[in-house]
């Protein structure tokens, strides 16, 4: 390690080039400031395509250039931006080409308020994405509240300022303090419980208030638990945390944000002068509306009066109308009577045409005609049937077995009356009957002889 970069330099006898000077200076800076921690605020942030990050780190009185090369920049989890307070670690070096000295960084982290600001922005984005800041969730403040709950510290100027405003502007309003810590480790839990208790009391409105302080002092109002407790309140709530320039997460979630606790009280405590002015305005509006209404009613009455006619004229018109209706009624009756007479005449004509006497005469004539035709038809029918019967009898005689028997043939019958068709159906000694054309004979079989029979050819 070079203990004294200038120990061999004789300024009276040796002249250095610019490059030599910058090189000696770089070695000196890197040797003495090999690793340092520096805290400041980012400005002039640049991100070229190479992946390196360049910015200026500054405080109120001075600034220094910083370089965060790609391999180290990849390890930084925070979103870098101008104005972010950070704490960096690195070595002091010198860029020989320009003679600028700079910090070559190997670590970067949020510093102080910078870390809190990152947490603030992260929670703000989360709750905004859930819709907790949307206007649709905001409740309107009551115009004339009677009971107001105040969630704040029981000591300090805040509660005194709020009470003073109400005494001056609206002494009739009942104020109730729900005490809570507004700073420190226990503040978050106490504020949440105080809000829940106040919301259950049925107040017309709530005030969540605290005086000014640093970001760390006001941090409990940026906790997610407090923000969700404010959002859960059914009672309209005004949030007044810190000074006018201080903005908390609770301010975004509340129904109304007031820049100061006194301003919150004034929002809920309209002054007597304001009320009197509003009353005067309402009175003037009422008088104007009454005058306008009376004027319109008077004009309407005049119009009705002009349209109103004398009763005698109305009676005369009604009498004329009655006469007209009477004439119309008489004409209608005459038309109805004539129409009825014409219809009656048509019905009489139809009735005469359909008289039963005429129908009976026609039926009687038809009966006489049919009576004269009946004997002839019966004789013709009987004659035809007789001829048909004779033809059938002749046909029957031709095919009758009796005709065959009359020609010398006979039929043998057994004791059951069944015809014997073959000699094989008989037995010697069997008694049979022989039916002839004119009678029957009892015969006995002496013997049966089967003989072949030659059938005639067709």
From Swiss-Prot:
CDD domains recorded: ExoVII_LU_OBF (cd04489)
Principal location class: cytoplasm
EC number, UniProt record: 3.1.11.6
Gene Ontology terms: cellular component: cytoplasm; exodeoxyribonuclease VII complex
Gene Ontology molecular function: exodeoxyribonuclease VII activity; nucleic acid binding
Catalytic activity: Exonucleolytic cleavage in either 5'- to 3'- or 3'- to 5'-direction to yield nucleoside 5'-phosphates
Catalytic EC class: hydrolase
KW Hydrolase (keyword) present: yes
Localization annotation: Cytoplasm
Any one Pfam family match given in the protein's UniProt record, by short name: tRNA_anti_2
InterPro entries xref list: Exonuc_VII_L (IPR003753), Exonuc_VII_lsu_C (IPR020579), OB-fold_nuc-bd_dom (IPR025824)
GO biological process, any: DNA catabolic process
Keywords: Cytoplasm, Exonuclease, Hydrolase, Nuclease
PANTHER family assigned: EXODEOXYRIBONUCLEASE 7 LARGE SUBUNIT (PTHR30008:SF0)
Self-association state and partner proteins as the record states: Heterooligomer composed of large and small subunits.
Role this protein plays: Bidirectionally degrades single-stranded DNA into large acid-insoluble oligonucleotides, which are then degraded further into small acid-soluble oligonucleotides.
Protein family: Belongs to the XseA family.
Protein name: Exodeoxyribonuclease 7 large subunit
Species of origin: Stutzerimonas stutzeri (strain A1501) (Pseudomonas stutzeri)
Taxonomic lineage of the native organism: Bacteria, Pseudomonadati, Pseudomonadota, Gammaproteobacteria, Pseudomonadales
Protein encoded by which gene: xseA
């Amino acid at each position: 390690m070079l203990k004294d970069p200038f120990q061999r330099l004789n300024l009276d006898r040796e002249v250095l080039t610019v490059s030599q000077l910058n090189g000696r200076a770089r070695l000196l800076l890197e040797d003495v400031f090999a690793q340092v921690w520096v805290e400041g605020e980012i400005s002039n942030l640049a991100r070229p395509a190479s992946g390196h990050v360049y910015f200026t780190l500054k405080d109120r009185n001075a600034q220094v250039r910083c370089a965060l090369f790609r391999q180290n920049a990849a390890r930084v989890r925070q979103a870098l931006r101008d104005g972010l307070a950070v704490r960096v670690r690195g070595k002091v070096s010198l860029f020989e080409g320009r003679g600028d000295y700079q910090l070559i960084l190997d670590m970067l982290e949020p510093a102080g308020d910078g870390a809190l600001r990152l947490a603030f922005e992260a929670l703000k984005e989360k709750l905004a994405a859930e819709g907790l800041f949307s206007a649709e969730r905001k409740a309107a403040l009551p115009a004339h509240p009677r009971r107001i709950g105040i969630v704040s510290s029981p000591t300090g100027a805040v509660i005194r300022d709020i009470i003073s405003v109400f005494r001056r502007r609206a002494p009739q309003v009942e104020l109730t303090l729900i005490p809570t810590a507004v700073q420190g480790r226990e503040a978050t839990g106490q504020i949440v419980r105080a809000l829940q208790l106040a919301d259950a009391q049925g107040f017309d409105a709530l005030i969540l208030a605290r005086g000014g302080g640093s970001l760390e002092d006001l941090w409990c109002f940026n906790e997610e638990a407090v923000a969700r407790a404010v959002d859960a309140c059914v009672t309209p709530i005004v949030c007044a945390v810190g000074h006018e320039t201080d903005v908390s997460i609770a301010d975004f979630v509340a129904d109304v944000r007031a820049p100061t606790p006194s301003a919150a009280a004034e929002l809920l405590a309209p002054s007597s002068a304001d009320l009197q002015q509003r009353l005067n305005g309402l009175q003037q509006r009422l008088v104007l509306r009454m005058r306008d209404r009376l004027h319109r009613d008077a004009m309407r009455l005049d119009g009705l009066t002009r349209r109103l006619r004398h009763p005698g004229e109305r009676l005369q018109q009604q009498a004329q109308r009655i006469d007209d209706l009477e004439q119309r009624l008489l004409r209608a009756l005459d038309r109805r009577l004539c129409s009825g007479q014409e219809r009656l005449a048509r019905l009489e004509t139809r009735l005469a045409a359909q008289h039963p006497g005429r129908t009976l005469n026609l039926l009687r004539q038809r009966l006489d005609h049919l009576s004269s035709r009946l004997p002839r038809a019966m004789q013709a029918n009987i004659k035809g049937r007789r001829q048909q019967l004779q033809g059938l009898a002749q046909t029957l005689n031709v095919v009758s077995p009796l005709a065959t028997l009359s020609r010398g043939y006979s039929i043998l019958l057994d004791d059951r009356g069944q015809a014997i068709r073959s000699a094989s159906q008989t037995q010697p000694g069997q008694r049979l009957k022989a039916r002839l054309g004119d009678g029957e004979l009892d015969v006995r079989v002496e013997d049966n002889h089967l003989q072949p029979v030659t059938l005639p050819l067709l």
